[in-house]
Swiss-Prot record:
It is found in: Cytoplasm. It is an enzyme of class 2 (transferase). The lineage of its organism: Archaea, Thermoproteota, Thermoprotei, Sulfolobales, Sulfolobaceae. Keywords: Cytoplasm, Lipid biosynthesis, Lipid metabolism, Magnesium, Metal-binding, Phospholipid biosynthesis, Phospholipid metabolism, Transferase. It catalyses: sn-glycerol 1-phosphate + (2E,6E,10E)-geranylgeranyl diphosphate = sn-3-O-(geranylgeranyl)glycerol 1-phosphate + diphosphate. GO terms for cellular component: cytoplasm. Prenyltransferase that catalyzes the transfer of the geranylgeranyl moiety of geranylgeranyl diphosphate (GGPP) to the C3 hydroxyl of sn-glycerol-1-phosphate (G1P). This reaction is the first ether-bond-formation step in the biosynthesis of archaeal membrane lipids. Mg(2+) binds at D34, T64. One of its GO terms (biological process) is glycerophospholipid biosynthetic process. Pathway: Membrane lipid metabolism; glycerophospholipid metabolism. Pfam families: PcrB. Its cofactor is Mg(2+). This is Geranylgeranylglyceryl phosphate synthase. InterPro entries: GGGP/HepGP_synthase_I (IPR039074), GGGP/HepGP_synthase_sf (IPR038597), GGGP_HepGP_synthase (IPR008205), GGGP_synth (IPR010946).
Amino acid sequence: MKIRKKKMKLKGKVKKYLMDKLNDNEKLHFSLLDPFKINSSEELKYIAKNLYNVGTDAFLIGGTLGVSKDKLDFVISLLDDYEIPKIIFPSNINLLSEKADALLFLSLLNSDDIYYVIGAQIVAAPIIKMLQMEVIPTAYVIVGHGGTAAHIGKARVIPYDNFELATAYTLAAEYLGMDFVYLEAGSGAPEPIRPEMISFIKKASSIPLIIGGGIRSVEVALKLVEAGANIIVTGNIIERDVDKAIKIIRGIKNK
């Protein structure tokens, strides 16, 4: 069990925190918590404590449907005791809160709707400035199954086996100055991003890759890490079987 001190101030320092770890060749894990799917504060506290103690590197808070500002703030407040970053993973401009340590400032690059590429970002920018939130510019690219995120975001999903297209998107994100590329197979996807896609991309680009969607076992997570994934995100498995999520985190952090 990995016990860490609490109450380290992270506001304004989240990007540095992440980059320092990546520069030390650490492989990171983010725990994605959907406020809409959390049934009670006791459940959240139990889950968060276990994820934290085995070494998850950050809490991502967000969901595609049903998340109110009050529920978002409530969840972030319950996570306040833990020294790792609380990062908002927004689906729209309603998911902004000064209580968070940072915000993934996402652009859904393969959306057919300009709103999700740059429109929402323009609307959100003055609010983010007013709230003095730290932003982490991140290209969001949906692959394969895509799930609800692809449907809502009107994404032209990249086929699982189209490595060249995924690489082109990654290079475009790098040249646009993004800090990260988040390759998303979708919540509950029947298949995760393929390791072969990650290794293909890594031959062309050094931008850090966040990989999420369909990761249900430590074996799958380790294959993604070995292929070059820098950050693994799990969410659905946390909701369904926290013990499996714990095994995934242990595997990644002991790699």
